[in-house]
């Protein structure tokens, strides 16, 4: 609609009903129209974030793996909504929830777990500490806020910056350097899957630090 037409104001976001009311064919100008794909993506993201979690979950159903049940899909929507530009983006963002532990572990190399300010040996110690923290949380208490509080405390005790401490955890748990919010993701994965994936990462790190 904005290719050749303007509402005469700075407004950019309209519902279809609002456009139908405001649009005038006589105000369409010929020539000079430029299709801005980046702007379209931005507007699409705005519309996505305006949806309720329930509405977005319904729209995402055909874009996410069939293995992700409706309850889990609705639970992950709040974690990914702000990151979505297009509905199709959701598939990659939620894949870690349905991938096997082996597939997740196969997505990264040992050195990808290591923050820039640390060595592989130091990272192994930090990740082992993170595992101990998670193992100390009962399954019924395995919630985002509790996990974040305990992990931040552990990072401080080790003298690690939170971002550095969280990096190997994120990659171990999701197989990716970029993912939905870490602690919400951990809550959805559950205690046992988190522990299993960190164990797999520790095994990979042990090979990295083992003497030749």
Regions found by a protein language model. Name each.
Residues 1-48, 55, 171-173, 177, ...:
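Alpha-helical recognition segments enriched in aromatics with Gly/Pro capping
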Residues 30-36, 68-76, 156-164, 177:
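Structural motif
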Residues 142-212:
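Charged substrate- and nucleic-acid-binding regions of tRNA-handling and nucleotidyl-transfer enzymes
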């Amino acid at each position: 609609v904005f290719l050749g037409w303007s509402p005469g104001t700075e407004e950019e976001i309209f519902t279809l009903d609002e456009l139908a009311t405001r649009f005038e064919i006589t105000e369409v100008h010929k020539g000079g129209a430029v299709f801005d794909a980046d702007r379209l993506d931005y507007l699409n993201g705005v519309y996505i974030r305006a949806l309720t979690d329930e509405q977005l979950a319904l729209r995402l159903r055909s874009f996410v793996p069939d293995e992700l049940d409706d309850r889990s899909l609705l639970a992950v929507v709040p974690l990914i909504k702000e990151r979505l530009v297009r509905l199709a983006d959701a598939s990659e963002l939620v894949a870690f929830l349905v991938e096997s532990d082996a597939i997740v572990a196969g997505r990264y190399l040992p050195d990808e777990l290591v923050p820039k300010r640390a060595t592989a040996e130091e990272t192994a110690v930090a990740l082992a500490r993170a595992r101990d923290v998670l193992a100390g949380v009962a399954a019924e208490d395995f919630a985002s806020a509790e996990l974040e509080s305990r992990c931040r405390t552990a990072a401080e005790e080790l003298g690690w910056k939170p971002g550095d401490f969280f990096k190997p955890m994120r990659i171990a748990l999701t197989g990716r350097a970029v993912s939905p919010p870490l602690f919400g993701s951990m809550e959805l994965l559950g205690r046992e899957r988190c522990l299993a994936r960190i164990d797999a990462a520790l095994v990979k790190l042990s090979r990295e630090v083992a003497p030749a």
